[in-house]
Amino acid sequence: MTARILDGSKIRDQIFAELKDEVRLLTSAGVRPGLAAVLVGENPASQLYVKSKIAACEEIGLSSALLTPPATASTLELLAVIEDLNRDNDVDGILVQLPLPPQVDTKRILEAVDPAKDVDGFHPVNLGRLVSGRPGLVACTPAGCMEILRRNEIPIEGANAVVLGRSDIVGKPMALLLMHANATVTICHSKTRDLPEVLRRADIIVAAMGKAGFVQPDWIKPATASKPGAAVIDVGTNRITDSQEAEHLFQNFPERLEKFRAKGSALVGDVHPDAIRSAGALTPVPGGVGPMTITMLMSNTVKAARLRRASPKFSATQSTASAR
């Protein structure tokens, strides 16, 4: 059987339509949500990412501002930029594009952002809110994964869910979100024993390890005539350039192999492409989780605008680094 494809681009379009309506309502009430992006230096990849985020703001009607400190900016200079944005009532969300230059203390910069404006969901205060189940801003990629599951009506409550990876940005918040949705959650990592057996029991797999084609098809609960098989959310985005690796991964996908040979590289997830023949449902790479990250950034910006105005305490919360 062939897995059902969980198309992130379609869900992106659905959510963008909903956000446009909400932004119109807020704007008519005198509140136009706004996002400020801080791009340090002239890294081409970072410039491209920020450009796509600004374009998304324009698409749904958010105001946006781009601040471009030089690549030589110091930690103290960037802290001053963040402080100004924290105080600006027209700014609901602050995005610091990573990576920052090596002379900058990245952790200190991220923790200086007002948690109420932390639309990336990286701040320890927002992670703490997630742990306790309180309203807050959730890291964009895990939030996007949850939207994929819910909007495709994948059963979560009571499901055995396995999260591969334990990063602060994806793995840990993903596990918490699944737990709050009443799944039974297992977090796996490089020290996990008998990983294939753990995965074979999973109804939901979220792969976020950063290893191309790591999860093998026979590690995934297969779909049968009476059971749906595992739903696989592939967060990995790995660019491969080795021809032998490509031939191994794409041996059953001649079109993808031809594209690799023509381009010299390809994007693959953490799940082997052959999993499409074993899983019950699967996010493609590219086109699955990827479109959802910017989508949830936009959603968080609108959410921040609501929360800041509805809850003065939430808006007033400042990080220790920011207070210094």
Short names for language-model regions:
Residues 1-11, 104-108:
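Helix-enriched interaction subdomains in cytosolic or periplasmic regions
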Residues 2, 9, 15-21, 25, ...:
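Adenosine-phosphate binding glycine-rich loop
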Residues 35, 57-71, 185-187:
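Short beta-strand elements in bilobed, periplasmic/extracellular small-molecule ligand-binding domains
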Residues 40-55, 136-251, 263-273:
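Glycine-rich phosphate/diphosphate-binding loop of Rossmann-like nucleotide-binding domains
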Residues 77-89:
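Short, well-structured alpha-helical segments in soluble
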Residues 90-91, 202:
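Short, high-confidence coil segments that cap the C-terminus of an alpha-helix
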Residues 93-157, 198:
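Anion-binding alpha/beta catalytic cores of soluble intermediary-metabolism enzymes, centered on
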Residues 96-103, 211-213, 237-240, 288-289:
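Short glycine-rich anion-binding loops that position phosphate/pyrophosphate groups of nucleotides
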